[in-house]
Structures are given as structure tokens and as C-alpha cells.
């Protein structure tokens, strides 16, 4: 819900509206945008597999983990893109990406959070596209688009997240405030992919 509120708040401030129902992830150049789209496709694949196997108990934790990463990693790292004045291509891509993620996520969560999904759908999709289906529950369930899954990028981002989390733990242990700059921070990586991530 926080991600949805963030998008709606800043979209209203900038008077931004989605231009088309057909988003093009292949046009994205920002690594954060490409990562969240890849992660969303991985989530879509996992949710479909788990639901097909009637393992609904595995669906909600995967969704919660995704939402946590969306709000606490993607949006926090992208905030300055939304805050800057003017509407350059990077800012527009940030809006388009977050809108697309929330649009697909709304459909993914509909079976397990029907009322939240419906509220988000009514405000996101129907406001922008009045000819869309009148309810999220009348839309096709999302299917994975494998070509947008980038496992290497997801692994790199996971490593960076882990490094940041461990850095916060060390800051806490040493009583160093988050906003205080560090003179240096050493990350040890034993694999080439993780070395490239840093």
C-alpha cells in the first residue's frame, strides 16, 4: 500500500499519467528499473508454479518479500528520480516502471488480498484506462515473460543488498549513525559476479 501511495502522491504532484497500457521493459536503461522488472517476472513465475501445485502457503511469503524489496530497496533508491524537477526520460521511466510493477502486482495479489487489490486496481487502472475490465478479478492472471528475467542482475542486486544490510549491522554495533559518511567500507567478494556488483 505504501508503494501505491508513493506513486499516486508523486504522480499527482507531477501530473503524470500512464500513456499506454503497453509498457516496454526492453526500453529501460536504469539497472534498478531492469532489476525490479526482472524480479517481478521471477515472482510471477514462482507464484504461478506454486498456485498450480496447490502450494498456496508458499505464495504469500514470496509476495511479502517482493513488496518489502519494492518499498525498502527499489523506491528508496529511486526517490531522487521522482523528486527532481522537470520530466526527463529517467524520471518518466521511473514512473512507468513503478506503475507497471504495481499494475501487475495488483493482479498477482488479487486471489490472496482481494479487497486491497480491487482498491488499487480501481485507482490505478480504471482511472487511467476507463475501458479496462471493471474489476481486477475479471482480468487475466499475469503470466511470466521469461525474456525479461535477468538472473545475473538479480544476483548482483541481492549481493549489494546483503552488503548494505551487513554495513548497517556494523554501524549499529559501532554506534555510527546511518547519515554519517564512512571514510571507507571494504566488501570481500570471492566470486566474479559479486565483485562486478560492487
Question: Which stretches of residues belong to each language-model region?
Answer:
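Short, hydrophobic/amphipathic alpha-helical patches that form generic packing surfaces
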Residues: 2-9, 104-107, 166-169
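Short helix-adjacent coil turns
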Residues: 51-58
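Aromatic-lined ligand-binding clefts that engage carbohydrates, nucleic acids, or primary amines
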Residues: 60, 64
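Extended, charged helical/alpha-beta scaffold domains that provide interaction surfaces
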Residues: 168, 172-198
Amino acid at each position: 500500500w505504501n508503494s501505491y501511495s508513493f506513486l499516486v502522491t508523486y504522480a499527482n504532484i507531477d501530473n503524470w499519467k500512464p500513456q499506454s497500457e503497453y509498457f516496454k521493459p526492453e526500453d529501460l536503461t536504469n539497472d534498478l528499473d531492469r532489476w525490479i522488472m526482472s524480479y517481478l517476472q521471477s515472482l510471477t513465475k514462482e507464484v504461478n508454479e506454486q498456485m498450480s501445485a496447490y502450494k498456496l502457503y508458499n505464495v504469500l511469503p514470496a509476495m511479502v518479500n517482493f513488496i518489502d524489496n519494492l518499498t525498502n530497496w527499489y523506491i528508496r533508491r529511486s526517490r531522487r528520480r521522482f523528486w527532481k524537477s522537470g520530466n526527463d526520460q529517467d524520471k518518466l521511466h521511473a514512473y512507468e516502471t513503478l506503475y507497471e510493477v504495481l499494475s501487475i502486482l495488483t493482479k498477482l495479489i488479487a486471489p490472496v488480498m482481494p479487497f486491497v487489490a480491487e482498491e488499487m486496481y480501481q485507482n490505478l487502472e480504471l482511472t487511467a484506462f476507463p475501458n479496462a475490465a471493471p474489476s481486477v478479478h475479471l482480468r487475466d492472471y499475469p503470466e511470466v515473460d521469461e525474456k525479461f528475467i535477468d538472473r545475473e542482475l538479480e544476483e548482483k542486486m541481492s549481493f549489494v543488498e546483503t552488503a548494505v544490510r551487513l554495513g548497517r549491522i556494523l554501524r549499529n554495533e559501532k554506534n555510527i549513525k546511518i547519515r554519517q559518511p564512512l571514510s571507507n567500507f571494504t566488501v570481500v567478494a570471492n566470486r566474479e559476479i559479486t565483485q562486478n556488483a560492487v
